[in-house]
């Protein structure tokens, strides 16, 4: 019995085995422009905020997009907002020795999408859905897990329209479709960058008008990496890891038929 338990523990994967150790983090007093610059440089959407190495919270592209688009913050450029003004203090922490199975059980559940790995109040790393993708091994077809009920927008729709859909339906990104053809993707990240640029370059008195008229085609991400329904789940995970993206549209005969996210892929993991 003791030997079996020892073997099971030996084979058990822990958070420290998959977490990102070289964490990009910021002090609470840095300006929001610096935060956005880091997100763009390292292609990340979440950054822990610290003070004297103690974790205070997390900043996400979602929160930045919301804050910069809110009426109260209109006219205030990102360079004049501090990280502390957009920090999410409702964060979760885990210890480095936590069983990965415990983390997988949280995937898809309401709550934070980044877990901060802390020991003795010191931030050692973070673990996100992207870090868990190497666990995906299923050879089932993407068609068996893809989301078929889609929310889409057109390139000539306004950015504020896309943002409203994302808030109301609690989704992080939208496919952009023009006359049945997928032409781009828009997410919290693109919206946050666009709002920051608008506030920097447009005079205060004209910002509301420009924001109301800002079109999706002006900020959407293109070209789009996609898969077909017959792509295997494990290959889809590899594509996400190679391209550092959180979702993949599914096309069949050049028609958008579904979408898969990291969450969809991780739900196939039997660990």
PLM feature segments, named:
Residues 41-65:
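Generic amphipathic, hydrophobic interface segment in small proteins and small subunits
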Residues 2-22, 60-91, 100, 104-108, ...:
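Tandem CBS (Bateman) regulatory domains
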Residues 26-43, 50, 93-111, 118, ...:
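The conserved cystathionine-beta-synthase
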Residues 114, 173, 189:
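RNA-contacting regions in translation and RNA-metabolism proteins
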